[in-house]
Design a protein with these regions (language model features):
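Glycine-centered, phosphate/nucleic-acid-interacting loop/turn motifs that mediate DNA/RNA or nucleotide
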Residues: 95, 243, 299, 308, ...
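Catalytic cores of enzyme domains
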Residues: 141-287
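Short amphipathic alpha-helical interaction segments
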Residues: 78-93
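Short, amphipathic alpha-helical interaction segments positioned at domain boundaries
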Residues: 105-142
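Ferredoxin-like iron-sulfur electron-transfer modules
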Residues: 108-110, 247-253, 275-325, 343-346
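A short, conserved structural fragment
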Residues: 92-103, 310-311, 338-339
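Short acidic, hydrophobic short linear motifs in intrinsically disordered regions
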Residues: 66-77
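Flanking helices and flexible, charged tails adjoining ferredoxin-like Fe-S electron-transfer domains
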Residues: 320-374
Length: 374
């Protein structure tokens, strides 16, 4: 379907009409497990209009979760093959849609807005995009953050966990690094976004770690700085020293990034500190404990905790309902009085096996049907 006649005579687009391709794309994105709920002020449509042309939004609104070749998409939608392929390639190059290898070439599919489209705009984010995202964040993001299972899961660095304790690879940041073949780091779009809207935080920007099961995966990237495994560990320790919380995608297999987060800029953790949503991030399998003999009540752990999970009177004490098991406080204790131990089994939420399992659980929690996307 051509959109050349869609705008009115003044070149304007009516954002409220049901025929608006941005509205249809927003509705399509909201059928994904991640969610992209409508706002009261139409900020989600303005966001999409900033990133997609009308024609691109129309095409993207008809993509599926599963990958299809450009030929399959063109034939399914009754579109001209060459122009369809060029438009799909352009959107994939800008991180607006998903792409991957198929037996007969490249395939294309629908990509969530978060985590997905938005994070891919690291190279082009400006003040306008930052402010549009903030409008949407304040208006509708609480819905996204309230859906279970959570998008992110906290993992400790590994050294903060009690020795001789069995730890699955997906339960610690070190285990995730060890399972990769390539490592890299890039700037954090969350901290760039808050800086652009005039609310910068003190934490370092070059903190988003990415991994891959493929060797030399980031050798030709313009935005990702390739790292050796040792450099990846050094970056993790640098984040730890900055008091940042390590979080990953909330599944056991396919953890290919480690976000090093703060409650002042991180889109996920701000949900807890700023929006008051309790379960924005899944806790780790561990909880902090205090050795009352070693503790001298200095209070450094209280200052380092981003979740207000510690208090000090005669000695430090832990609020188990607020502690997410990140281990940040463990490294700040000069007397080594803190250590992470495994939570009681009944308190540990099962971690989804993979992205599909995670998605199906969120779909069930939302009560939506994703059959039209398959």
């Amino acid at each position: 379907m051509s959109l050349l006649n869609y705008p009115n005579q003044n070149g304007e687009v009516n954002m409220n009409t049901e025929h608006n391709p941005y509205k249809r794309l927003a509705e399509r994105l909201d059928t994904l497990p991640n969610g992209f709920p409508p706002s009261d002020d139409g900020s989600e449509l303005k966001l999409l209009a900033k990133l997609f042309t009308l024609e691109e939004a129309d095409l993207a609104s008809q993509l599926r979760i599963i990958l299809e070749s450009s030929t399959q998409i063109a034939e399914r939608l009754g579109l001209e093959h060459t122009s369809t392929r060029q438009m799909l390639k352009s959107m994939a190059r800008r991180g607006l849609i998903r792409t991957g290898k198929m037996d007969d070439g490249l395939g294309y599919g629908l990509l969530p807005f978060v985590v997905g489209i938005y994070e891919n705009q690291l190279g082009i984010i400006d003040e306008e995009l930052a402010r549009l995202f903030e409008e949407y964040y304040q208006n509708s993001f609480p819905i996204v953050l309230s859906i279970q299972p959570s998008i992110h899961r906290v993992v400790p660095i590994g050294e903060s966990i009690k020795m001789n304790m069995q730890v699955a690879p997906y339960e610690s940041a070190a285990g995730i690094i060890e399972n990769a073949q390539s490592w890299g780091v890039q700037d954090c779009i969350c901290r760039i976004q808050t800086r652009l809207i005039g609310k910068p935080c003190k934490h370092p920007v070059d903190m988003c770690m990415v991994m891959s099961p493929v060797r030399d995966a980031f050798a030709n990237s313009n935005e990702i700085k390739p790292l050796t495994k040792d450099e990846a560990y050094a970056t993790l320790h640098r984040a730890d020293q900055a008091g940042l919380v390590h979080s990953v995608s909330n599944n056991q297999r396919g953890d290919w990034y480690i976000c090093n987060c703060c409650t002042c800029s991180c889109g996920i953790l701000r949900g807890m500190a700023e929006l008051g949503i309790a379960n924005v991030v899944a806790s780790s399998a561990f909880i902090n404990t205090v050795d009352e003999i070693l503790c001298n009540a200095c209070g450094l752990c209280v200052e380092s905790c981003q979740f207000d999970a510690l208090t000090v009177e005669m000695v430090a004490s832990v609020n188990g309902t607020r502690c997410v098991g990140c281990g940040v406080c463990v490294d700040t204790c000069p007397d080594h009085a803190l250590i992470l131990v495994r939570r009681p089994e009944e308190e540990v939420k099962p971690v989804p096996v993979n992205l599909l399992d995670w998605g199906m659980q969120r779909v069930k929690d939302r009560g939506i049907d994703i059959t039209p996307l398959l």
